[in-house]
Structure formats: C-alpha cells, structure tokens
C-alpha cells in the first residue's frame, strides 16, 4: 500500500503571487497532516520562487510525519540540507526558466558529482532519493551513486492521452521492477491527479506518491483536510481502472 506525500509548494505560490504572508505553508502542512498526509514535501528552488528558507526551517520544527526536501544538486542546497536535516532529500533537476520540473535527473551523465552529494548527505543521516525517468540506464546509475531511493517521474504518464497512457504506465511498472531488482526503494510523482493516480498507486512495490497541485486545487472547493483525505483513499485503495481493465502491478 502506497503512502501519500503532500507537496505544499503551490500554497507558497499563492502567497508569493502577492508577496504577502498568507496563505502560510507551515500551517497548511499541519492541516494536510490532520487530513492524513504521511509526509510533507517542499521544493526549495534556487530562485526561491515559492518556498522560502524560513518555511523549511519552520517545517522542520513543526512537521510530525516526514519532511521531504526537494532541491537541486548544488553546494548551497547541500549546506542547507545538512543544517535543516530533513527526513529525506530528493535531488531534482532545475532550470530557472521552467514553470515546473520538466523531467528526471541525468544521473548517468553526472554520476561523479551526484555520488559525492549522496555520500555527504547520507553520511549525515539524511536518506537521498533521486528523481529520474523510468529508464534502466538511469536507474543503474542511481544505484551506483549509493542512493537508496528513487522517485520515478510520472509526467509523461500524466500528460499522455488515452491512446498512449497504457504504454507510459507500462514504462513505470517496468521501471519500478528494475529499481527493486537493483535494491532501490521506489516513490513516484509529478502531474498525478485524482483522475489518474490509481493505476500508479497500484503498482507493486510503489512506496509513496508525492502529489501537490491537484490537492491544492481541490482544496479551494472542499478545504485542504478533505482534499488530502480524498486523495489518500485513492492512493491506499486503488480500484480496477476501466482504461486498463485491471489494477497494474
């Protein structure tokens, strides 16, 4: 049964749109936990477009589930993680001009630098996950860095139409199986919604799904606690999917 990590970046996006103090991501994280979130995820970007350093500091003090810090693989971010000590760091690719993360890390192409960061963080007791596309070459490279976790990028699955989504689901199923064979633990996320999450949640070996935008969007209508509750039902009890005919796994 997969657990649910709630990404609260979009709460901070609303705040930063007016450069004001509300809504407060820290208090919203508490509501997400009250709604059943198994963890809280934030992405501290280099340009600080939404989550700010102070948010991460306060979340470390207040989160009672797990705090997953997404960040670029830079010396500045490693130093922040070593000071804050989140429950997990997820290294993600980052470009200032992107609206949101556009793809997985090229771990195979930067194995040496990523290995050094993984070793530094894990030596400090911080587990590291690498955000990658579900490709065998990248997964093997993740294993070679010494990381214990991967987060599979579900963006292509989320963006696919009905005719190609089954193939994208199959890529994620295969990627999960390969990762497990390598001894890696598997999370997934990006672009998942109430409409498409169940086939991913049903993949055998999937441990956690990190989901943000769709939960925050639904919270406008039903409140954050209820939006989290609604998503957790789907993540933990995925039904047979009519598009694919069976629960994947």
Swiss-Prot record:
In this record, what's one Pfam family?
Answer: PdxJ
Q: So, what pathway does this thing act in?
A: Cofactor biosynthesis; pyridoxine 5'-phosphate biosynthesis; pyridoxine 5'-phosphate from D-erythrose 4-phosphate: step 5/5
Task: Identify the keywords attached in UniProt to this record, alphabetized.
Answer: Cytoplasm, Pyridoxine biosynthesis, Transferase
Q: Active-site residues?
A: 43 (proton acceptor), 70 (proton acceptor), 190 (proton donor)
Give the residues the record marks as binding 3-amino-2-oxopropyl phosphate: 7, 18, 191, 212-213
Listed GO biological process terms: pyridoxine biosynthetic process
Extract the coiled-coil ranges from the record.
none
Give the UniProt entry's GO cellular component terms: cytosol
EC number of the protein: 2.6.99.2
Q: Write down the InterPro entries for this protein, in alphabetical order.
A: Aldolase_TIM, PyrdxlP_synth_PdxJ, Pyridoxine-5'_phos_synth
Q: Where in the cell is it found?
A: Cytoplasm
Residues that hold 1-deoxy-D-xylulose 5-phosphate according to the record: 9-10, 45, 50, 100
SUPFAM superfamilies linked to this entry: Pyridoxine 5'-phosphate synthase
A GO molecular function held by the record: pyridoxine 5'-phosphate synthase activity
Q: Where is this site: Transition state stabilizer?
A: 151
As its record notes, the protein acts as a catalyst of: 3-amino-2-oxopropyl phosphate + 1-deoxy-D-xylulose 5-phosphate = pyridoxine 5'-phosphate + phosphate + 2 H2O + H(+)
Family assignment from sequence similarity: Belongs to the PNP synthase family.
Q: What does this protein do?
A: Catalyzes the complicated ring closure reaction between the two acyclic compounds 1-deoxy-D-xylulose-5-phosphate (DXP) and 3-amino-2-oxopropyl phosphate (1-amino-acetone-3-phosphate or AAP) to form pyridoxine 5'-phosphate (PNP) and inorganic phosphate.
Record text on subunit structure and interactions:
Homooctamer; tetramer of dimers.
What protein is this chain from?
Answer: Pyridoxine 5'-phosphate synthase
Q: Where does this protein come from, organism-wise? A: Synechococcus sp. (strain CC9605)
Name of the gene encoding the protein in the UniProt record: pdxJ
């Amino acid at each position: 049964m997969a657990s649910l990590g709630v990404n609260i970046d979009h709460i901070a996006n609303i705040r930063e749109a007016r450069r004001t103090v509300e809504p407060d991501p820290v208090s919203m994280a508490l509501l997400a936990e009250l709604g059943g979130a198994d963890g809280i995820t934030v992405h501290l970007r280099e340009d600080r477009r939404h989550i700010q350093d102070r948010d991460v500091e306060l979340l470390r003090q207040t989160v009672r589930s797990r705090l997953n810090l997404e960040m670029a693989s830079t010396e500045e971010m490693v130093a922040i993680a070593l000071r804050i000590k989140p429950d997990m760091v997820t290294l993600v690719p980052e470009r200032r001009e992107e609206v949101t993360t556009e793809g997985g890390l090229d771990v195979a192409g930067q194995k040496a630098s990523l290995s050094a960061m993984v070793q530094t963080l894990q030596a400090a007791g911080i587990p590291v996950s690498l955000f990658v596309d579900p490709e065998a070459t990248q997964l093997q490279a993740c294993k070679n860095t010494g990381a214990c976790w991967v987060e599979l990028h579900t963006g292509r699955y989320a963006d696919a139409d009905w005719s190609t989504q089954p193939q994208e689901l199959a890529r994620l199923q295969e990627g999960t199986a390969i990762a497990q064979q390598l001894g890696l633990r598997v999370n997934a996320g990006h672009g998942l919604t109430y409409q498409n999450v169940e086939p991913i949640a049903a993949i055998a070996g999937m441990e956690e799904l990190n989901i943000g935008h769709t939960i925050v969007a639904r919270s406008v209508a039903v409140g954050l606690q209820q939006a989290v509750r609604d998503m957790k039902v789907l993540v933990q009890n995925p039904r047979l999917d009519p598009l694919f005919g069976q629960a994947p796994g």
